[in-house]
Swiss-Prot record:
Every EngB-type G domain range: 23-209
Taxonomic source organism: Cupriavidus taiwanensis (strain DSM 17343 / BCRC 17206 / CCUG 44338 / CIP 107171 / LMG 19424 / R1) (Ralstonia taiwanensis (strain LMG 19424))
Stated name of the protein: Probable GTP-binding protein EngB
Record keyword GTP-binding present: yes
Classification of source organism: Bacteria, Pseudomonadati, Pseudomonadota, Betaproteobacteria, Burkholderiales
Cofactor(s) the record lists: Mg(2+)
TM ranges: none
Length: 237
């Protein structure tokens, strides 16, 4: 079982000064208000109401932290960070300004941030605001993994095209950097439970969770060559 299943609500933050003063790694989830971010977090953590999604898109304008640790552990091993959804037109100007500042400052300056899970609707990936989020985060030199959500809404050929074009866009961004940074993408569907294990593996690896370390050891053990068995001695010799 993934340790992500043990995630628990930790704190809500509305200003950078209130971010937890911890040294453990964090993985942030970002995306448009209607990209299915909260639903995906719940599915990845095998919980129904860990991350709440407002009935009115754009209402969530703060940062929610979820701790990841075994049930009886005294301290978190890591955090999942649910960032405010962006791009909803009915948010007031002052709220939108605060919201955008909180998002950009967090993703650009948070030293504990190990990677960004960027959620995009598979039917319309890389909107202008999605590109803005990538451009904010790119200079940090940390990895980005795109979840193309709502893949169940598309045909197989449409999904293949969306994934191919998304990877091409990410490659273009990666080529802007002097030092290569992992920028990956996958299809994801909360409804069809598609892509869950793949996404969990990425997150666990970034957070250095025990399950990721175990997965690294298992292929090495499977591919190791057993020691040669010496030939039996001939009793008649």
């Amino acid at each position: 079982m993934s340790l992500l299943h043990q995630a628990r609500f930790f704190i809500t933050v509305n200003h950078l000064r209130d971010l937890p003063a911890t040294a453990v790694p964090e993985v942030a989830f970002a995306g448009r208000s209607n990209a299915g971010k909260s639903t995906a977090i719940n599915i990845l953590c095998n919980q129904k109401r860990l991350a709440f999604s407002s009935r009115t898109p754009g209402r969530t304008q703060h940062i929610n932290y979820f701790s990841v640790a075994p049930v009886k552990a005294p301290d978190p091993l890591a955090f999942l960070v649910d960032l405010p959804g962006y791009g909803y037109a009915e948010v007031s100007g002052s709220a939108k300004y605060h919201w955008q500042g909180l998002l950009s400052d967090y993703v650009q300056t948070r030293q504990q941030l190990a990677g960004l899970i960027l959620m995009m609707d598979a039917r319309r990936p890389f909107t202008d605001l999605d590109c803005q989020m990538v451009e904010w985060f790119l200079p940090t030199g940390r990895p980005i993994h795109v979840l193309l959500t709502k893949a169940d809404k598309l045909t197989n050929s449409e999904n293949a095209k969306a994934l191919r074009e998304t990877r091409k866009m990410l490659q273009g961004y990666a080529e802007q950097l002097e030092t290569p940074v992992p920028m990956t993408a996958q299809l994801f569907s909360s409804l069809k439970r598609r892509g869950i294990e793949e996404a969990q593996a990425v997150i666990a690896g970034w957070l250095n969770l025990p399950e990721a370390r175990k997965a690294e050891r298992e292929p090495a053990a499977a591919n190791s060559v057993p020691p040669a068995v010496p030939p039996a001695s001939d009793p008649a010799a």
